[in-house]
Amino acid sequence: MSGIKRTIVCKHGQAETERELLTIIKNGGTVHNVTVEHGVYGNLEGSLHLTSENDVNRYMKRMKNTNAAVLSSISGGIHTHLIEAPTAEIMERILKALEKEGFLYS
């Protein structure tokens, strides 16, 4: 995808991870990464590259099967995602959906 990229700041608990990612994907976006700020190590980034519901399902299954905590668990749920949308209109739709769900943090 080569479109509009934006870094968004979100906050939620581990239980809301799937809903957050699907909100982005179902509204036409791609989730490239997740980044958290650590007091000692600085920014810690995990590559995601999620483009479909199947990608999200596989990611969530891996997290469950490995009993892994989401990266944002070390930052009180605050994290950023680099997301991408094919058009500015779709990016706006994604942001409005995230805001409606209470995921955006400012």
Walk through the language-model features, giving the residues of each.
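Minor-groove-contacting beta-hairpin "wing" of winged helix-turn-helix DNA-binding domains
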Residues: 1-2
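Mid-protein regulatory/catalytic core that forms ligand/cofactor-binding pockets
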Residues: 6, 10-106
